[in-house]
Curated annotation (Swiss-Prot):
Gene name of the encoded protein: LYS4
Annotated residues for binding of [4Fe-4S] cluster: 367, 427, 430
UniProt name for this protein: Homoaconitase, mitochondrial
CC cofactor: [4Fe-4S] cluster
Role of this protein: Catalyzes the reversible hydration of cis-homoaconitate to (2R,3S)-homoisocitrate, a step in the alpha-aminoadipate pathway for lysine biosynthesis.
Annotated SUPFAM superfamilies: Aconitase iron-sulfur domain, LeuD/IlvD-like
Species the sequence originates in: Mycosarcoma maydis
Location in or out of the cell: Mitochondrion
Cofactor: binding details: Binds 1 [4Fe-4S] cluster per subunit.
Length: 734
């Protein structure tokens, strides 16, 4: 078949270029029978980790090189193509690994947007990449429907809702655009395995309570960053009563909860769902006469693959390590609504119903709640009724496959007959694009996943989140309320929710970290510093965001020099910071083995906020070689490592400095930078050992020793650092 020919699987356009030499599918590191116990996240990462030392096994906290089974990009594919070209790459390492799905701005029919989409399709055609055009559906839904996101595999995407894949037992996590370009070119990128939180769901949901209510409640009741930058594993007796569609909704919104992944186990519910999907696809293919053999015609969704999966199910080991243990009794849950304008505010539906909150717009769209079962739930509420006067009700299916199924079931027609306004399958209002956005002073209720101020329109509007049934009921009543057939007498008391949180009995200490090497530490590359050393600057500020580190007014000055970035670093946080660091840098001199320079220590969630990589490069250009913090914003940390800035955590060091310097402020970290008097910190790259000496506030000399997390800088980070950043690392490998 020539390069111009197209192979079609349902609605997918498969662009085939057999003349392009394809490398084999991603190779996995063999799972080693190493001593110890491992959770499910660690076991899946082990399958996709590469360049491990013989006999090693990955653990939470480790930096590893991963070769994911799938990498998906959407409308941001254009910038990734630019990065791909800038690193000198000319061919895709493994086209079978890459998927393009256009879904965000699909209502935009401008010549500029259509040209952008055309260029992305042409690139896919040239390189033999699976391409799903605008209208096929939201990329995350497509990855599940087409079997790219498959149980016990690893899939990544340049989008924060990659967590959704966990609903089918696939470990999904977001990456940034530079990572995507690196995977295109080399098949791999790096990842720090997060801490893993065990979330135990007990009991069974009462009638009228949904998976959306579960995650809205989790976000609202555990709203103190308990799962920030963690991977979540769902456990418990309650899982058997949750459908795959409900699991997908829950996993999807673990992103808003603050997690980097939300993983359900592969169980009988999962296997039965996949068998049903395969049979359904077979029936369709027989109808159109394109299936040469039943159940094995699809390259990813077929009975052979499902049978193999059922024989090789992974389970966490008894005694596996989790940082926290959260429990939620599903039987005590009632319908909940999130907001306004925050997922951290979760209110029982009956409380809001009594307030008679009028709405202007309602939305049944997005990757969290626009599957066929969601459309059915809304249609069952609205069938034979009409949307209230003055209310606009927007509906978009998660994919064209979903819409076709809803049309055949009569659910789509019921929604349209009631006065709903159809939108093409895609993100649309959820991302603030297209028609139907909230205007000043309006109130909206949505089945989407985010209600941040201004996300769905005007920042002067109010947005609530709820289940599809509640959204539909609100649309026909013109106010926030539940369906008329919701029997509240069968629900538990709205104030009776049972939930708990504890530190897992076998959790590692806050500063503990694993390393696969012996007690001597990780192996250090010849060209990587054996240690980092210098004076210590304490920035006692939690949630120091990227705008505080690098002001937004400079972000789009593309011609700004490294020197200028260094001059404005931390300008919005502490105007004197840059000059202080410049003075310290002038007195530093590195040796061949030790990297000298001022070491910065921040508070918790350092670098939260936007994805601007200048927040990392400005610190590096200022002469700071390494940042310590209680914890980091994940995207900041990825950008830092991708640009050769080392990031390590030390919970105890942050706590000790807080007690010493902020006692009069009640221990609240909300102050400008402090240069520790006569300070010197030495950080061993192999072991993560931190040796610190300085004069305290009272003039007394203090010497302390800590262990960073991870306890030793991983090989993947070392390689990126010595190459001069991820882009140069990729250049060396293509």
């Amino acid at each position: 078949m020539g390069a111009s020919n197209l192979l079609r699987f349902g609605a997918v356009t498969r662009i085939s270029t057999p003349l392009l030499s394809r490398r084999s599918l991603a190779t996995h590191a063999a799972v080693n029978p190493a001593s110890g116990t491992y959770n499910l996240v660690e076991k899946i990462v082990q399958k996709y980790a590469v360049d491990l030392s013989p006999g090693s096994h990955v653990k939470s906290g480790d930096y590893v090189s991963i070769r994911p089974g799938t990498v998906m990009t959407h409308d941001n594919t254009g910038p990734v193509i630019s990065k791909f070209g800038s690193i000198g790459a000319t061919s895709i390492y493994n086209p079978d690994q890459v998927v393009f799905a256009l879904d965000h701005d699909v209502q935009n029919k401008s010549a500029k947007n259509l040209e952008k989409y055309s260029k992305i399709e042409s690139f896919a055609r040239k390189h033999g990449i699976d391409f799903y055009p605008a209208g096929r559906g939201i990329g995350h839904q497509v990855l599940v429907e087409e079997g790219y996101a498959f149980p016990q595999t690893l899939a990544v995407a340049s989008d924060s809702h990659s967590n959704m894949y966990g609903g089918v037992g696939c470990l999904g996590t977001p990456i940034v655009r530079t990572d995507a370009a690196a995977i295109w070119a080399t098949g791999q990128t790096w990842w720090q395995i997060p801490e893993v939180v065990k979330v135990e769901l007990k009991g069974e949901l009462p009638k009228g309570v949904t998976g959306k209510d579960v995650i809205v409640a989790l976000c609202g009741y555990f709203n103190k960053d308990q799962v920030l930058n963690a991977a979540i594993e769902f456990h418990g007796s309650g899982l058997s009563s949750l459908s795959v569609e409900e699991r997908l909704a829950i996993a999807n919104m673990t992103t808003e909860w603050g997690a980097l992944a939300g993983l359900f186990p592969t169980d009988d519910v999962t296997l039965s769902w996949y068998e049903k999907q395969i049979r359904k696809r077979d029936k369709l293919e027989f109808q159109i006469g394109s299936s040469p053999s039943p159940s094995n015609s699809h390259p990813r969704l077929n009975m052979n693959r499902l049978d193999e999966l059922s024989r090789t199910l992974l389970r966490p080991d008894s005694g596996a390590v989790y940082s926290k243990h959260l429990t939620l009794d599903l039987a005590t849950l009632v319908p909940h609504v999130s907001g306004p304008n925050s997922v951290k505010v979760s209110t029982p539906l009956d409380e809001l119903t009594s307030q008679n909150i009028a709405i202007n717009k309602a939305y049944l769209v997005s990757c969290v709640n626009s599957r066929a079962s969601d459309l059915k739930a809304a249609a069952d509420v609205i069938r034979g009724k009409k949307v209230a006067p003055g209310v606009e009700f927007y509906v978009a299916a998660a994919s064209s496959v979903v819409q076709r199924e809803a049309e055949e079931a009569g659910d789509w027609g019921a929604l349209m007959a009631a006065g709903a306004k159809p939108l093409p399958a895609g993100c649309g209002p959820c991302i603030g694009l297209g028609v139907g956005l909230l205007e000043d002073g309006e109130v909206g209720i949505s089945a989407t996943n985010r209600n941040y101020k201004g996300r769905m329109g005007s920042p002067n509007a109010q947005a609530y989140l709820a289940s599809p049934a509640v959204v539909a009921a609100s649309a026909i009543e013109g106010k926030i309320c539940g369906p008329s057939d919701l029997d509240v007498s069968l629900l538990p008391p709205s104030k009776g929710l049972k939930y708990s949180i504890s530190t897992a009995a076998n959790a590692a200490p806050a500063d503990a970290s694993s390393t696969d090497a012996s007690a001597g530490g990780v192996e250090i590359l010849d060209s990587f510093p054996t240690a980092f050393s210098g004076p210590l600057i304490f920035a006692p500020q939690d949630n120091l965001n990227t705008d505080g580190i690098y002001p937004g007014k400079y972000t789009y000055q593309d011609d700004i020099t490294p020197e200028k970035q260094a001059e404005v670093v931390m300008e919005n946080y502490d105007a004197s910071f840059a000059s202080t660091v410049a003075g310290l840098r002038a007195s530093s001199s590195s040796s061949s083995s030790t990297k000298q320079g001022p070491i910065l220590i921040g508070g918790y969630n350092f670098g939260t906020g936007s994805s601007r990589e200048q927040a990392a490069t400005a610190l590096k250009y200022a002469g700071i070689p390494l940042v310590l913090a209680g914890s980091f914003g994940d995207i900041f940390q990825r950008n830092a490592i991708n640009n050769g800035l080392i990031c390590l955590e030390s919970h105890q060091l942050v706590q000790d400095l807080t007690r010493l310097y902020l006692e009069n402020e009640g221990g609240v970290r909300n102050s400008k930078a402090i240069l520790l008097d006569e300070s010197k910190v030495h950080i061993d790259s192999s072991t993560g050992s931190i040796n610190l000496s300085f004069k305290g506030p009272d003039g007394a000399k203090i010497e302390r020793t800590y262990t960073a997390k991870p306890a030793g800088i991983g090989r993947s980070v070392q390689e990126i650092y010595t190459a001069g950043g991820l882009e140069k690392w990729v250049k060396q490998r293509i």
